[in-house]
Design a protein with these regions (language model features):
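Amphipathic, Lys/Arg-enriched alpha-helical "gate/interface" segment within cytosolic domains
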Residues: 1-130
Length: 130
């Protein structure tokens, strides 16, 4: 498993289809940092889409602009589906805003743990063209 450390997140390439991005504690994620994550994924996968599992550390949030950027049509070039691991009720509310307000054009589900998120991502592998 390969991992890449960026200023706001750690990106782990779990297998050829699944990437886990963990946003570090006490960060305010901005659009350029979301793009940096997308750039690392695109470079590693040579432009091939991935299934993305996302977890967020304590005290970390995304600016409204970063959420909008992460859900924009352009983001679908990198990500086929998202599994968001929610750590608490407040984070679940923020994740629901991301899904309902920004309406990314790809499947997104919220989960309470990594195992459930991974099981769901396994059912989404058909979204990635060989």
């Amino acid at each position: 498993m390969r991992s890449v450390e960026l200023e706001v997140c750690t990106i782990e390439f779990l297998d050829q289809d699944v990437v886990h991005t963990h946003f570090k504690d006490h960060r305010s994620v901005q659009p350029d940092q979301v793009q940096a994550m997308f750039d690392v994924i695109a470079e590693d996968r040579h432009g091939r889409k991935v299934l993305l599992m996302v977890s967020v550390g304590e005290g970390t949030s995304m600016s409204n602009e970063a959420r909008a950027y992460a859900s924009a049509d352009d983001s679908n070039r990198y990500i086929a589906a998202d599994a968001i691991i929610v750590r608490d009720f407040g984070h679940q509310l923020a994740a629901n805003v991301f899904v309902r307000h920004h309406k990314p054009g790809r499947p997104i589900q919220l989960f309470g743990d990594q195992a459930s998120a991974m099981a769901w991502l396994d059912t989404q592998r058909h979204l990635i063209a060989s």
